[in-house]
Structure formats: structure tokens, C-alpha cells
């Protein structure tokens, strides 16, 4: 719980609430409205001792309705009004801006029908231009569907995105936001697709050599620094290793395989290159959407599954390095104390219990409601019967609900009321340390 700095920005402790889809400040489904439910969640986490808070990623080009983020000035005015309330918590806020998904865009059956029917594709283009949304570094198969392939982005489109990042960052700075995070040379999202040789086969200045493959990410930070100043912090969401064997083929922990994406030799070079380009922090994990479980670890992934690789690349940079991915708080604290890490990233645990950091600080760990790593409410690719995610379509993306906390992001629908008829009850409580149970009486 010691302070640290990202550039000139001081963060009160080492706990980082990392981005999750659905915790956005600007909703996607209603043309980038200011999302009060997302804002409430973020403030609750900040109030309960998250030091650095990162909302869900904001596309600089909205895949719904095709609107550029910098063009809707009203939501920045709403954000500016809200920021003083947030800053009362003592936390800092970095808004995560994304270039989008490229070939990783999740394709539903409805989208397949829209794309494969020429008439429907034309009619749907004003509100969902799948051809533009799924464009990537080079022609590639979509991660989820064989029916919606990704075309190559044009140079003009790349330049449009670079300009949009700079304009959006400046508006966020003027609204009082403490910094931005660029999404992402991470998890096989669009920017990452440009860096990965198995996706990028371009022959222009955005493909081929190492410098060309990382050019898109470099131009973004340089454009932001030009309009916001060198002191405005810019973090980068970064996957150390791709852990990928090929399209739709991910590697498992301990598996011997040939890496088709970013290996450690390239990563050691890349982190220094990106630091020297102007990035002020690396927010790290592993994986691509072809190996998605490294960045969104389910229950069968080991604790701290990305920590060893993240600790390794910290040796090659001077800027702060954060690690996320099923982090154990005590292990993270040991790594930070030893100087092998600067910050610890947590995400879904905040959905399960927004007060968990406060409870840990007050030695009330037995009261923490743990994330059970099920993905049922927080990850919309995992829709089982009885899924706890009952959002309406007008909500942002059907994400960031929780199987063990019905109130999270649904306070207007699910809330606990004090009973008018109190009774004594008995229940069995499990000790999180040794697994033993005890009977407890409560009123």
C-alpha cells in the first residue's frame, strides 16, 4: 500500500483496478452516453482503496453506429462534472482507449446473417459496418466465425485512428482525467494484430520489419503526447507473450510449443522500444484471443499465471510495470516489495466484492466475497443456462455482472432491503485458509 508514480502522476497504492468490458464510462449501445452505472461501480472501487482505476475500454471508433468517440462532446461535459466526486476518493483515473477488435470481434449468428446476405449487409451498414469493424492488419480468419473474414485496413484508416486517439485523449485530459491507457498491444486485439507476424503480412510501412509492425502503436503515443504534452501519462496494455500456436490454437501452461506470435526475445526488445516511443507504463498479461484464457484466467488456470513473464520483462525497462491475471494479493505484495513489480492488477474480484481491498486492509479477509472464476456474469462468450447476466440490450455489451454478487452493476434491479421481520438463523461458514467449517448464529 505504498505510493508510486506513473510519470509525474502519483498513485496512492499499488492496487490497480484493470479494465473490464461493461465497466465503461461511455456506453456503447446508446451512442456513447455517459454511463452512470459504470461510474458508480468505478467510484465504489476507488472509495474502497483501489489506487489506480481503469474503466472498460472505450473504442475511438464505436462499432455500434460508427461514431468517432471525439465527436460526442456532451459525454465529456458529463465526465468533467463527475471527476471531482471521483477525485475525492484519492484514487487516479486512466481511461482506456481502444482501436478495436479486428479479427477478434465476437461474431453472433445474427451478425453472420447480416454479413452473408448482401442486401442485409447494405441495410445494416449505418449501425453496424462489419466490414470496417473486423478489418485487421492483413486478410485473416475471424477468431469466432468462418463466415465473416477480416479484410486489410487501409493506410488512410490507420491514420484516421491515430488522429482519433489524439483527439479523444485531449478531450479526456480537458475533462480532468489523470491519464489514458492504449488498448492494446495485448490479447490479439487490433493493435496487437499489427505486431504479430502470423497476422500481419503487409508490405507497406505497417508490416514486415519489427519497427513497421509496432509503428501503429508508436504513432498513437506520439500523437497523444504532441497534443496533451509530455507530462500527460500514457499507459499501454501489453501482453508479454502470445502463448499462441496458430489461428484459434492457444497454448496451455507447461505445454511445449512453437510460438507464432510474440516470443520472449521479441518482447524484451519491444518493451524498451515502446518505452522509448513515449509510453509511461506497461499494464501486462499474456495471450491472444486465440489463447484467451491467459488474459481472462478461468478456474483451471494457475494463480499468478502471468507473473513470472511480467517480472522478467521489467528488467528491460525503466517505466512502471503492472501484472494482471489471477493475481494472489500476498504474492503480488512480495513481488512489489522485492522490486520485481510496480503494481498489481485485479479486475473480476472487484465485481464480486467492491470492498475487498478495504476488508483486506482492516484484516477482515474472512468477510471477502471471492470471485469464483466462472465467467458466467462477466464474460458474454460464456452464456450457460441460468446465466446471472440479465442485462437488456440497451445496456453496455452484456458484461460485468457477477454470479456471486447480483447487485454489481445492477443496483437498480437487484438490491438487499432490510427485512421487516428479523429472525435468528444458523449457517455454516467455510474457513478460506484451511477449508474447515463452523456453525455460526446470526440475527
Where are these regions (language model features)?
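Flavin-dependent oxidoreductase catalytic cores
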Residues: 1-443
Amino acid at each position: 500500500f505504498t505510493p508510486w508514480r506513473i510519470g509525474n502522476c502519483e498513485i496512492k497504492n499499488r492496487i490497480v483496478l484493470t479494465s473490464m468490458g461493461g465497466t465503461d464510462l461511455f456506453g456503447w449501445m446508446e451512442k456513447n452516453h455517459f454511463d452512470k452505472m459504470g461510474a458508480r461501480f468505478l467510484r465504489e472501487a476507488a472509495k474502497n482503496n483501489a489506487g489506480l482505476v481503469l474503466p472498460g475500454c472505450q473504442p475511438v471508433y464505436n462499432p455500434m453506429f460508427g461514431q468517432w468517440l471525439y465527436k460526442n462532446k456532451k459525454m465529456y461535459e458529463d465526465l468533467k462534472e463527475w471527476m471531482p466526486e471521483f477525485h475525492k476518493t484519492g484514487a487516479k483515473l486512466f481511461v482506456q482507449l481502444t482501436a478495436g477488435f479486428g479479427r477478434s470481434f465476437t461474431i453472433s449468428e445474427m451478425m453472420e446473417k447480416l454479413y452473408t446476405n448482401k442486401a442485409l449487409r447494405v441495410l445494416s451498414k449505418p449501425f453496424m459496418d462489419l466490414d470496417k469493424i473486423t478489418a485487421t492488419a492483413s486478410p485473416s480468419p475471424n477468431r469466432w466465425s468462418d463466415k465473416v473474414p477480416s479484410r486489410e485496413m487501409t493506410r488512410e484508416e490507420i491514420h484516421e485512428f491515430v488522429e482519433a486517439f489524439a483527439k479523444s485523449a485531449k478531450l479526456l485530459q480537458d475533462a480532468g482525467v489523470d491519464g489514458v491507457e492504449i488498448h492494446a498491444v495485448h490479447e490479439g486485439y487490433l493493435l496487437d494484430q499489427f505486431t504479430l507476424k502470423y497476422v500481419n503480412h503487409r508490405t507497406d510501412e505497417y508490416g514486415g520489419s519489427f519497427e513497421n509492425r509496432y509503428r501503429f502503436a508508436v504513432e498513437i503515443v506520439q500523437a497523444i503526447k504532441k497534443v496533451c504534452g509530455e507530462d500527460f501519462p500514457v499507459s499501454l496494455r501489453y501482453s508479454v507473450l502470445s502463448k499462441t500456436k496458430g489461428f484459434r490454437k492457444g497454448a496451455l501452461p507447461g505445454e511445449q510449443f512453437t510460438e507464432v506470435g510474440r516470443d520472449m526475445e521479441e518482447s524484451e526488445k519491444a518493451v524498451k522500444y515502446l518505452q522509448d516511443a513515449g509510453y509511461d507504463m506497461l499494464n501486462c498479461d499474456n495471450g491472444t484471443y486465440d489463447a484467451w484464457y491467459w488474459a481472462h484466467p478461468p478456474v483451471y488456470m494457475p494463480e499468478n499465471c502471468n507473473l513470472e513473464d511480467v517480472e522478467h520483462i521489467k528488467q528491460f525497462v525503466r517505466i512502471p510495470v503492472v501484472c494482471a491475471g489471477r493475481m494472489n494479493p500476498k504474492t503480488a505484495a512480495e513481488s512489489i516489495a522485492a522490486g520485481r513489480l510496480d503494481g498489481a492488477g485485479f479486475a473480476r474480484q472487484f465485481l464480486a466484492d467492491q470492498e475487498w481491498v478495504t476488508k483486506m486492509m482492516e484484516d477482515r479477509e474472512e468477510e471477502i466475497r471471492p470471485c469464483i472464476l466462472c465467467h458466467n456474469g462477466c464474460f458474454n462468450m460464456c452464456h450457460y443456462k441460468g446465466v446471472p447476466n440479465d442485462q437488456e440490450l440497451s445496456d453496455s455489451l452484456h458484461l460485468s455482472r457477477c454470479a456471486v454478487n447480483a447487485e454489481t452493476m445492477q443496483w437498480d434491479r437487484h438490491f438487499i432491503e432490510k427485512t421487516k421481520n428479523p429472525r435468528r438463523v444458523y449457517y455454516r461458514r467455510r474457513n478460506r485458509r484451511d477449508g474447515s467449517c463452523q456453525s455460526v448464529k446470526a440475527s
